[in-house]
A protein has these predicted regions:
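Nucleotide-activated sugar donor-binding and catalytic core shared by glycosyltransferases
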Residues: 1-53, 58-193
Length: 193
């Protein structure tokens, strides 16, 4: 499968035995905050922080200027087109639970940590992901260090969350929807070859 990790593969540390924690805030980078990343950096486990700032130039500039002050190695990226690949190579995703991000994380089998979801769709997605064991909802940034350390030092729990995320994922959703629509088109209305 192109997008998913594969049903049999556990969450593996990135190169050199290091886990990778992906922090995203949507295409505009509004969910990724400097304070969130600063709190994440206080976690005691060994990992690389991969931040996608989207089009949020201010956050990108802040992070680049303060990069040397962080304990954990950090990659800072602006707008990216390879989100699915980044998720597949991440042990954990900290981000907003919008529809597209949640769907991509589930297909990739990447567990989520969700902080301060917005009312409406994000809260509904959060409740569903937490109920199925694919995500953890945190109310405050300051809870990040303990939760991230606990997850990354407990591979069994992290693998279980990844498996539950994969079980929710629908890698063929677009094709399935197209086939369902085509199945309801009467033969006489179908275009001629």
């Amino acid at each position: 499968r192109r997008h998913g990790r594969g049903a049999h593969l556990p969450v593996a540390p990135a190169a050199a035995g290091r886990f990778r924690v992906l922090v995203m805030g949507g295409s505009r980078g509004l969910g990724a905050r400097f304070a969130t990343i600063r709190h994440l950096d206080r976690a005691t486990s060994d990992f690389t922080i991969d931040v996608v700032t989207g089009t949020n130039r201010r956050l990108r500039k802040q992070l680049l200027a303060a990069r040397h002050k962080f304990r954990h190695p950090m990659r800072i990226r602006g707008y990216v087109r390879n989100v699915a690949a980044m998720m597949r190579h991440s042990s954990l995703l900290i981000g907003k639970p919008g529809g597209l991000t949640s769907a991509e994380a589930m297909v990739a089998g990447t567990p989520m940590l969700i902080i301060r979801p917005l009312p409406g769709q994000e809260r509904g997605n959060t409740e569903m992901l937490v109920r199925h064991g694919a995500a953890i909802h945190l109310d405050r940034d300051r809870d990040l260090p303990a939760v991230v350390t606990s997850l990354l030092t407990n591979p069994t729990l992290l693998d279980m969350m990844a498996a539950r995320a994969r079980a929710l994922g629908k890698p063929d959703a677009a094709r399935d929807i197209a086939n369902a629509v085509l199945a309801h088109i009467p033969p006489e209305a179908a275009p001629a070859p």
